[in-house]
Amino acid sequence: MSQDFVTLVSKDDKEYEISRSAAMISPTLKAMIEGPFRESKGRIELKQFDSHILEKAVEYLNYNLKYSGVSEDDDEIPEFEIPTEMSLELLLAADYLSI
């Protein structure tokens, strides 16, 4: 795998490839990638999250990367949709990932 990407693995063993730049938005993932951990090899197992939660977290990291330099007043930024039924689990994931 290219060093430009990181693979995140969910509790149910689904894999999500994410750009290293997007992953580095999360201080937690950044520490894993840059540290002496086996995760620094480009594969990070996040076994505390089901795939639908990890997928939404990856979506958010990509969204954040894409719109990070855009003014909040810009009408071009779409709202990031969070389904109500996922709110609590996403809050826990966001807390863990510090995003």
From Swiss-Prot:
List, alphabetically, the SMART domains matched.
Skp1
User: What's its job?
Assistant: As part of the CRL3 E3 ubiquitin ligase complex; polyubiquitylates monoubiquitylated RNA polymerase II subunit RPO21 to trigger its proteolysis; plays a role in global genomic repair. Prevents degradation of interacting proteins like PCL6 by the proteasome.
Query: What Gene Ontology cellular-component terms does the record carry?
Result: Cul3-RING ubiquitin ligase complex; cytoplasm; elongin complex; nucleotide-excision repair factor 4 complex
Supply the name of the protein.
Elongin-C
Q: Which UniProt keywords apply?
A: Acetylation, Cytoplasm, Nucleus, Phosphoprotein
Give the free-text miscellaneous remark of the entry.
In contrast to other members of the family it does not integrate a functional E3 ubiquitin complex. Present with 538 molecules/cell in log phase SD medium.
Residue numbers carrying Phosphoserine: 2
Q: Report the transmembrane regions from the record.
A: none
